[in-house]
């Protein structure tokens, strides 16, 4: 196996340039090195000005989302050896404003996420002495896969609807709202309806499915969105047929 590989890294330094450029770096190559290891080597040994996000290095925190050879990937879970003989082109996630180099502005996602109330909503609280809220394995399975989301935002980078319409609520936010709607302990489905069923919510999705393909945790946001469309349509039909109490 080759012992070196070239990484072409997108650089954007707003104080000295008006648009991103690419800079090539040659880094050591071992089978164990992820793209994040290559970037860390560049920062530590070749160019300390390179900026990028990372935290856990284990594909859990979701911090290292980037565009690698054109695909939305976690840099910590994507290996340099898979791109031999190179080069490996590393760019920021798409559909987000670039702050510097590989660092993007995620404030739009962070502002939208609370709107779906991604937490357990209870309108009645049983006495503490009644104990915890118990679930059967089947009740857990109903929402478990959607709870695996790590907020890496790769689904937003992959989503053609979000690329065209930044007002779109987006795959992860809708899937997380649906995660709690499907939780037997939650009572907040009606509280989320105005946001999830809005024109910029689930109905804006055109079911391209790139979000589900991009998810590093196997979450199916596209499936969650289509299921919610059915829920929203059923509710709307009930309201039409039974306006005095259609739920």
From Swiss-Prot:
GO cellular component term of the entry, any: plasma membrane
Binding sites annotated in the UniProt record for [3Fe-4S] cluster: 159, 205, 211
Residues forming the 2Fe-2S ferredoxin-type domain are 14-94
Pfam families referenced in this protein's UniProt entry, alphabetically: Fer2_3, Fer4_8
**Broad EC category:** oxidoreductase
Keyword Transport: yes or no?
yes
Q: What is its EC number?
A: 1.3.5.1
**PROSITE patterns, per database record:** 4FE4S_FER_1, 4FE4S_FER_2
Annotated ranges, domain 4Fe-4S ferredoxin-type: 140-169
Q: Which residues bind [4Fe-4S] cluster?
A: 149, 152, 155, 215
First-listed, main subcellular location of the protein, grouped into a coarse class: membrane
Molecular-function annotations in GO: 2 iron, 2 sulfur cluster binding; 3 iron, 4 sulfur cluster binding; 4 iron, 4 sulfur cluster binding; electron transfer activity; metal ion binding; succinate dehydrogenase (quinone) activity
Which residues of this UniProt protein bind a menaquinone?
12, 226-229
Q: Where is this gene product found?
A: Cell membrane
Q: Which InterPro entries match?
A: 2Fe-2S_ferredoxin-like_sf, 4Fe4S_Fe-S-bd, 4Fe4S_Fe_S_CS, Beta-grasp_dom_sf, Helical_ferredxn, SDH/FRD_Iron-Sulfur, Succ_DH/fum_Rdtase_Fe-S, Succ_DH/fum_Rdtase_N
Q: Its domain of life? A: Bacteria
Q: Where does [2Fe-2S] cluster bind?
A: 56, 61, 76
Q: Which cofactor does it need?
A: [2Fe-2S] cluster; [3Fe-4S] cluster; [4Fe-4S] cluster
Keywords, in A-Z order: 2Fe-2S, 3Fe-4S, 4Fe-4S, Cell membrane, Electron transport, Iron, Iron-sulfur, Membrane, Metal-binding, Oxidoreductase, Transport, Tricarboxylic acid cycle
Subunit:
Fumarate dehydrogenase forms part of an enzyme complex containing four subunits: a flavoprotein, an iron-sulfur, and two hydrophobic anchor proteins.
Homology family: Belongs to the succinate dehydrogenase/fumarate reductase iron-sulfur protein family.
Q: What is this protein called?
A: Fumarate reductase iron-sulfur subunit
Q: Which species expresses this protein natively?
A: Mycobacterium tuberculosis (strain ATCC 25618 / H37Rv)
> What lineage is this protein's organism placed in?
Bacteria, Bacillati, Actinomycetota, Actinomycetes, Mycobacteriales
Gene responsible for this protein: frdB
